[in-house]
């Protein structure tokens, strides 16, 4: 009983000392807040007819609201700022204020797109502008490759431009994998969950709480995403916001790791980060290359994604999503297990593992209910 705090000062000391307990509270807070908000968004969206339209690429039936991202955003922002009151220092609070404003702007871009179909070019310009403001406003950027490909420190201007490019790339890559039930949500949970662990182990507790806030919000979203009666999609609203938050975590982690590498458990920080986001990056680059080879716009939507291939092989949405989630978990564990290797050797190993695993669905054919491997002829 003596351990229990009796006043505000003791409460703060208690929360700071028992960090696992505090982290669990933040995770639960985010989950509950989002759970409360999400059904209201479903009801309002149906009343206002803010729902997904079926087309040749969609596989859902019936009326499904597309503003799940509003619920995820609300749960995330309320939780992150609650955590900031308890644990953030002045610099973290200033950077969080910038993060809040820019995430809200990105949410508005997503809502506009979900309701009125913004052109890809306009979305790209908004994303680029928001990313540049974030990088220059917070001074959080990737300023080293840690020796990957022989590159170490990067000049400030180039580092800022490259970091903005990474953020825009990850926003769009995450947006493109949001094609079947559960996929974007599960990938987001795994990426943000590992980032929470990485921040915690490196002594950046507040940043781990940001990651856990997203985990809790996405778990709540997944419950409704898999529901039949109260089903909801992330929409561009959610995929852009979540993609931005995931990109923020990756850029922040690499920025911190370069400044204090001895405190970071994962010596090969870029390999760890690349493994986490390898699925959306690989899928996006593959699809873009195919479109360009076929002389089509790289922004033209189609059914050439890996998750579409898994569906064509007979997997239900949830099993296809679980397969990708398992892949993400597996390659991240591989990245951690080869952490002690020289970074370029680790990169080659990861490149081979990722390429083989993600091209495997295209080497499998299904005939008369049976699966078999097929290989290109010489």
Label the model's feature ranges:
Residues 61-65, 149-160, 266-273:
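Short aromatic-rich membrane-water interface segments that cap or initiate transmembrane helices
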Residues 78-93, 112-118, 135-149, 254-256:
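Transmembrane alpha-helix boundary signature
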Residues 97-129, 134:
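Hydrophobic alpha-helical hairpins/lids featuring a short glycine-rich hinge
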């Amino acid at each position: 009983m003596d351990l229990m705090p009796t006043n505000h000062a003791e409460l703060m000391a208690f929360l700071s000392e028992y960090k696992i307990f505090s982290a669990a509270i933040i995770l639960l807070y985010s989950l509950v807040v989002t759970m409360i908000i999400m059904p209201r968004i479903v009801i309002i969206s149906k009343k206002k007819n803010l729902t997904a339209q079926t087309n040749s690429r969609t596989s859902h039936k019936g009326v499904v609201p597309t503003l799940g991202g509003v619920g995820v955003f609300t749960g995330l922002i309320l939780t992150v700022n609650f955590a900031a009151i308890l644990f953030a220092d002045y610099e973290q609070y200033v950077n969080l204020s910038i993060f809040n404003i820019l995430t809200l702007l990105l949410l508005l871009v997503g809502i506009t797109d979900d309701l009125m179909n913004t052109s890809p070019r306009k979305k790209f310009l908004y994303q680029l502008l928001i990313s540049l403001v974030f990088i220059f406003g917070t001074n959080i950027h990737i300023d080293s490759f840690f020796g990957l490909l022989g590159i170490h420190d990067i000049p400030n201007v180039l580092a800022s431009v490259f970091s903005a490019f990474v953020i825009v790339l990850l926003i769009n890559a995450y947006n493109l994998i949001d094609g079947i039930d559960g996929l974007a949500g599960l990938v987001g949970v795994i990426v943000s969950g590992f980032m929470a662990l990485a921040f915690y182990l490196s002594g950046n507790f507040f940043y781990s709480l940001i990651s856990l806030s997203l985990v809790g919000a996405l778990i709540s979203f997944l419950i409704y995403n898999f529901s039949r009666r109260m089903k909801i999609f992330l929409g561009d609203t959610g995929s852009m916001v979540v993609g931005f938050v995931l990109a923020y975590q990756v850029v922040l982690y690499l920025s911190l790791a370069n400044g204090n590498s001895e405190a970071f458990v994962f010596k090969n920080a870029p390999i760890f980060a690349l493994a986490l986001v390898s699925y959306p990056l690989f899928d996006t680059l593959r699809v873009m290359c195919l479109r360009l080879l076929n002389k089509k716009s790289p922004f033209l939507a189609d059914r050439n994604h890996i998750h579409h291939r898994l569906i064509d092989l007979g997997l239900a949405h949830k099993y296809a999503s679980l397969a990708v989630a398992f892949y993400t978990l597996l390659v991240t564990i591989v990245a951690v297990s080869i952490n002690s290797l020289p970074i370029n050797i680790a990169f080659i190993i990861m490149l081979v593992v990722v390429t083989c695993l993600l091209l495997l669905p295209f080497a499998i054919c299904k005939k008369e209910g049976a699966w078999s491997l097929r290989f290109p002829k010489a």
